[in-house]
Structures are given as C-alpha cells and as structure tokens.
C-alpha cells in the first residue's frame, strides 16, 4: 500500500517589491549642499529616494505602535533609513529613532547610539568601559564640582557643553579666573559640563569616517590662533592613509556604540591614539574629499539593503494543505 504524504503549498515571501528605497532624515538646520550631494548619489543606487527634514515629520501613535509621515507618505515603508539628526533636535530625534528601530527598515545607527553619541561624557564613559583609549574626562553639573574636576586634569583643560557640536560650545580654559567667569555664565542656563584633559602641542587631529568595515581618514589642522582642529571653524584638512592603530580604534568605537556609519575623532597622546569624540552625523568634507565620503555612505546603504532584501525574498516557505 502506497503511503500518503501530506501536500504542501509554497507561500511567497512577505516583501512584494524588489525596488530599493532610501529615506534620508535631516535636522531642522540641515546643509542643503550636503543633502543635494547625497540625494544625487543615492538616485544612482536606489529606485526611490526621499529627503525629509525632521521638523516636517508627523509622528502618530496608535496601540503602542508609532508611525512616521511626511507629506502623507508613510516613512517606515522605506527599505533603508539614514537619520542625520543633530543634538539640537534631541527630543524629537529620540521619538523618530524609536519608531525607526521598531520598523523593518535598515538603519545604520540605533536609538542608543543617538542618545550616547550626543552626550560627550557618556560616549567617553561607554568607550573607556570597553577598553578604548580616550582622554581623561569628567562630568559636572555645577561650578563647584567642575572645580574639583580640575584637580584631576590641571590647567589648561578643555570644557565642552554636552549639547555642543561642530566645535561650538568648546572652550580652552587656561586659569581658575577664566574658568569661574565662564562657569557662572553656563550655570545660568543649567548646562551640563564635560571637561577633558588638554593635549598640549597638538594643533591637529584625525577624523576617521567609519562606513561598515571601510574607513576614510582625514587629518584636520586648526587655523592660526585657534587650538581647535575643526574645519567648520576655519581649519584645513587633507586625506591620509590611516594606520592599523587608527583603524582598530575607529572600527571598535563604532561597533561598541552600535553604528555602521559615523566619524571617530582621534588625537595623538604620548605616541598613542586616543578618542576625542564620536560624531553621529558628520559632515562629508566635500571641499577636501569631494564626493568620496558621500559615495561610500550611499554604496554601503545600497549594498546592505540589497543583501537584506535578497534574504527576505528567499524566505518563502512550505505550508501543509
């Protein structure tokens, strides 16, 4: 007697379209030239590309699930989402990042990485806890405790506002008198303060753009009369070949913080490289690197999205009938 075997029907994968789509979310004060460069490059790799400023995005919550809309379009329907949200938009940014994290879209950064990287002290704390070399840092909430911190760093030292970016909110303190006058002003705004040991004799640093396993390095030099090696503040820059030590520190920092795309700023201290800070939404330095960084961002997003989609299409399954 021939045994009866159950019949099976093939169930198609849940994804209906093979079209690749990319959403880029920008801050309220986004740089138009950077957006244009990213969109132009993305249109070569993706079938659909959309840029949405965060202040124009509508967030809806229903039954514990958040949705994002821009001009009536469901933003969580995109295959890939690259949020470039600054600390200025932190509260709204957290809500947007949380919604993205619960969607099926690929995102090269996480809610946790957004929260930590926008808090300079927490960044240092998390990295140092995993053995990544960094600069001696302290967190203070009052002039009194900032004064105690100086006993560890000594003068001069670097003072950073937690919410600062692009070299803003960063001051070199050379004396107790200077510190006290600045702290009095900061205390009026109830700002948290991160202090870091100043590395003397260094007028340059290295920014490592981490894009997956690939790293682009650029050496930044401060302008004359300014100790900050920040191009947005008038400094200069040039591409370099990263050393194995730079590569290891940059990649490890990105991995610990949960970012596939970011920038890790390094400075040399006692013949060793240390992390100064990690940037969640770095500028592409097009003046010095052309479209190199933008190209790598988009290439990585497109390749990762394609691989993820292929896995979904291959996940058809058999169901007994």
Residues of each region from the PLM?
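C-terminal active-site "lid" helix and adjoining low-complexity regulatory extension at the edge
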Residues: 3-6, 255, 268-321
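ATP-binding N-terminal substructure of ATP-dependent carboxylate-amine bond-forming enzymes
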Residues: 1-106
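Short glycine-rich, acidic/polar surface loops and turns
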Residues: 250, 261-269
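Phosphate-binding site of ATP-dependent enzymes
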Residues: 171-257
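Active-site nucleotide/adenylate-binding loops and adjacent lid/helix of ATP-dependent enzymes
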Residues: 10-28, 32, 36-40, 75-76, ...
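Protein kinase-like catalytic core scaffold
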Residues: 157, 216, 262, 274-276
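Short glycine-rich anion-binding loops that position phosphate/pyrophosphate groups of nucleotides
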Residues: 86-88, 163-164, 281
